[in-house]
Structure formats: structure tokens, C-alpha cells
Amino acid sequence: MTVRVMIVDDQAPFRLAARMVVETTDGFDVVGEAETGEQSVELAHELDPDLVLMDVNLPGIDGPEATRKILETANHRVVILLLSTYEEAEYGPRAAECGAAAYIPKSSFSPERLAEAWAAASSTA
């Protein structure tokens, strides 16, 4: 089974970098990208992804609020990973508060971290 991934970030260079990480990770495929929190909620409903890579700081509603909205309206279980340039100690707890499965600093986002986070989150389903 291929994991359907949606990338949410307002910075095009990071969306491109995240796409490269996802596409080089076996069993993962990018199905869509969004630039704002509002757009991510609409697109998640339309595309029905398995996994959302969500930036914390977004124009309009922020990543944690968009995460809550996506989880409230999802048709099935969606795993959301929060990503940001902030340190894990600062934002790790916020990930849990909004329902995200994990927080990954952008500086350590890699195919290995993606696969590990997905495995951990999907094993608790």
C-alpha cells in the first residue's frame, strides 16, 4: 500500500525539499500541496490523504489549528506530522495538544524520520 502524502508549507523551497524526501522514501507518494492553513483543510477533504506534513507557521490559520480542523472532518484516520524550524522541546507538546502524531524539526526531516514517524503513528491505529 502506498501512503498518500499532502505537504502544507507556505515556503515553496521547503515544499520542494519535502516532496523530494517523500518521493525518495519507499512506499510514499505526494498527492497534493497547500500553502495556507485554510487551503490545507479544503485540500485534505478533497484528496483524503493518509499523511499530512504540516508547517506550524502558516498565513491565515496556523498549522496546529488546521490540524484540528482536518482531524475533525476527516473521512478516515489521518496522520499529521507538524514540521517547523523551531526546536522540538518548544513545539513537541503543541503537536500532541492539537492531535498531531509527532513534531519533526525541519532540520532533521529525512526519509528515515518520515518512515519512523509514520510507522510509530500508524502502529497505534
Residue ranges and their predicted role:
Residues 9, 55, 84:
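Active-site residues of response regulator receiver
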Residues 14, 59, 88:
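The feature encodes the CheY-like receiver
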Residues 27-35, 43:
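Short hydrophobic/Thr-rich beta-strand motif most characteristic of the beta2 strand and flanking loop
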Residues 36-39, 62-65:
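Acidic catalytic/metal-coordinating carboxylates
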Residues 50, 56-57, 82:
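The short loop immediately C-terminal to the conserved phospho-acceptor aspartate in CheY-like receiver
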Residues 64-76:
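Short amphipathic alpha-helix used as the core "switch/output" element in two-component signaling
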Residues 65, 86-104, 108-116:
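Alpha4 helix (beta4-alpha4-beta5 surface) of REC/receiver domains from two-component response regulators
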Residues 77-87:
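A short, hydrophobic beta-strand element within the central beta-sheet of small alpha/beta folds
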